[in-house]
Regions:
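A glycine- and charged-residue-rich anion-binding loop/surface
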Residues: 1-327
């Protein structure tokens, strides 16, 4: 849900509890129930707004601390008081983008494990509205072919458009289903398992045909097709033995591809060639430039030798006290 009625339990300003806050105040709000997701597990916190009897406030971030959701707010109008009834509303479009990036991260994790090996494990992540970042254990850079294969795999399961399901169970039951746990995470008596994708006879899931199963408390799309598209931007070293992939999904991925297309079209026009002949044209121009540089270098050497030879021809001999000198 993205909208909820609640009661304001506490207001914090500059580290101290206060009874009320007015226009312009930057405060932290705690309510008895909330539709907002608090930053955790690599997923950013929700933003949105909170409305009350005589005013409203923007929620610019949400964090979770010891099970308590803290809403970082800026009061736009009115006076907000403790125990007041409020209505909270999450910014839906932003949450949708975050959900898409989080679900794509799960598909990316599984694609990397399938392509590179089971040594691949998550070492960190960021699931924001505009991009995703995924750190994983691997000792060397991915080749161009590996990156293409991983990206293609993620897009395959996006197009598969399977339902994304969540189930709460014991950690032991989750392990029996083949769910992946995050390195270093501590789990309680119950865990939430998020599954997506169909892979025949994978041995994962209730029917043994699951693709990605992970222990996760974050928000996700309803179907993998809701992700839209997946585009890898870069693969680099995060630290020793850890690689980092940055990627885009949905409209952001399509916009990036459109910009690339426009840029390549401009280059092709400048080079007076087609899009698919740009590389051969650049290689030809590079070879031509190298040849010209070599010719110019040789010409300069020849000119220098000619100058030396010319100076030698102009040398004259003079006799001083019976000794010949070249001048």
């Amino acid at each position: 849900t993205e909208v909820a009625q609640a009661q304001l339990i506490a207001i914090v300003k500059d580290g101290a509890l206060i009874e009320s806050a007015g226009k312009g105040d930057k405060v932290q709000l705690i309510v008895n129930q909330t539709p907002f997701y608090g930053e955790s597990g690599g997923q950013v916190g929700d933003i949105g707004n909170i409305r009350f009897e005589n005013g409203e406030a923007n929620i610019v971030d949400t964090k979770r601390s010891v099970g308590v959701f803290v809403h970082f707010a800026e009061i736009n109008s009115g006076i907000l008081s403790v125990n007041e009834a409020v209505e909270l509303e999450v910014e839906g479009l932003r949450r949708s983008s975050v959900r898409a990036n989080h679900s794509a991260t799960h598909l990316l994790h599984e694609a990397l494990r399938n392509k590179l090996g089971n040594h691949v494990a998550q070492r960190g992540s960021l699931n924001a509205a505009d991009r995703l970042r995924f750190d994983f254990s691997h000792s060397k850079a991915l080749t161009k072919d590996e990156l293409v294969a991983v990206q293609s795999s993620v897009n395959f399961y996006i197009r598969q458009n399977t339902e994304v399901s969540t189930r709460v169970m014991s950690p032991d039951d989750a392990r029996k289903l083949g769910a992946t746990a995050l390195f270093g995470e501590k789990y309680g008596e119950e865990v939430r398992v998020v599954s997506m994708g169909y892979q025949q006879k994978s041995g994962k899931g209730l029917d043994g045909n699951g693709y990605s199963l992970e222990l996760c408390g974050g928000t996700h799309v309803k179907r993998t097709g809701d992700i839209g598209a997946f585009l890898i931007l870069s693969d680099g070293a995060s630290s020793s033995g850890v690689r980092r992939i940055e990627a885009l999904t949905g409209e952001a991925a399509l916009d990036h591809l459109a910009k690339q297309q426009n840029y390549l079209t401009e280059i092709a026009l400048e080079l007076k060639t087609s899009l698919f002949d740009i590389l051969s044209k650049v290689k030809s121009l590079t070879a031509e430039r190298k040849s010209l540089v070599n010719e110019l270098s040789q010409l300069r050497k020849d000119m220098a030798l000619a100058e030396v030879a010319g100076e030698s021809d102009e040398l004259k001999s003079e006799d001083l006290s019976g000794v010949n000198f070249l001048v």
